[in-house]
Amino acid sequence: MDIKQVTETIAMIEEQNFDVRTITMGISLLDCIDSNIEKAAEKVYHKIVTKAGKLVQVGDDISAELGIPIVNKRVSVTPISIIGAATDATDYVPLAKALDRAAKEIGVNFIGGFSALVQKGYQKGDEILINSIPKALAETDFVCSSVNIGSTKSGINMTAVRDMGRIIKETSAASEMGPAKLVVFANAVEDNPFMAGAFHGVGEADVVINVGVSGPGVVKRALEKVRGQSFDVVAETVKKTAFKITRIGQLVGSLASERLGVKFGIVDLSLAPTPAVGDSVARVLEEMGLETIGTHGTTAALALLNDQVKKGGVMACNQVGGLSGAFIPVSEDEGMIAAVQEGALNLEKLEAMTAICSVGLDMIAIPANTPDTTIAAMIADEAAIGVINQKTTAVRIIPKGKEGDMIEFGGLLGYAPVMPVNKKSSADFIARGGQIPAPIHSFKN
């Protein structure tokens, strides 16, 4: 793959807000384990600074050479619950602060991995980490947190679901931005380059580079040229465009891993929007013929988009991974925000769309007085969709303000109207706790 190919590709896609959304370095912290939490925190800081010290500079150099914006440089680490479990500490905020200090030192804009994997139950470090989340996110600037509460192989840990409903409310009370940096997953992946859900899986190499690309504006421009034509043409157009976008991600990842002297992991084939006009997944779906996203046909349009992005992207790179699909975060997509304000898009339709897309109920503002049991029930519903359909689903919701308010996050996180939530109670359902067993079709052996 040479530079000529890249310049041709840029010309073909007419630079419609195309960017490489993130270069994320995954770093294993297993060799930083220590029974003393202060010593462990110091080891964590030094390993991140040593391994990722040149990440931002290399990203900037590649961006300048190729003329392609590389918006974010980020780091993901081994789930901190594993590192903390070796200590006798009763909270893991010192480890979160070490991550934050390292992020500031190397200049990345997020560091992910203040995480726990509890799909089948709690180990020693898991509950401590989960209870540390509100304070950890309030007292750091760049740390992101995630908790995996279910998987197709394990079922859904409903005790953890109940706890996370409470933790999201506590996180929202403790800080303005906290809930925007906290994701609850089912079927979380170990090589996700996107925040806030990135962590470095224990099955990964010591250090890897993962890349996430973004080009909804590019796909929309391509579809404008085939307006009114059949879905066969639409599918082929999306597929070819996704190939071009992903090819650039492959090149950027290859160059970054080569210059940093670390393994190249994956390209995530996700279409990630921003609040900027012309960078919206919602507008891509509307270009297929929907008056407004949220109307009937939205889920079918999303299914076509998601599938063809994967088909085009797979051909373009050596290894694909991460979440790979279309993101539908409300606050980060100008078209989604408009549809919510018009009343065309509600929580129930968003939930239906999550059966198709990457992730799930993402960056959605709900009233601050929503009970934690209702939030837990939303998590349970999303987890059920993921577990039954063998896909990643997640919840990143922000309980702030009252219905109709506009919540401002700023930057890539955008702004979101506070959406109405079903007021009937799920409290007795959530109070049961325990485990929803794995589905019958999970038994593959």
Curated annotation (Swiss-Prot):
Pfam families, sorted: DUF711
InterPro entries noted in UniProt: UPF0210
Similarity comment: Belongs to the UPF0210 family.
NCBIfam families (alphabetical): PRK05313.1
HAMAP family documented for this protein: UPF0210 (MF_01221)
Subunit annotation: Homodimer.
Protein name per UniProt: UPF0210 protein SMU_73
Gene source species: Streptococcus mutans serotype c (strain ATCC 700610 / UA159)
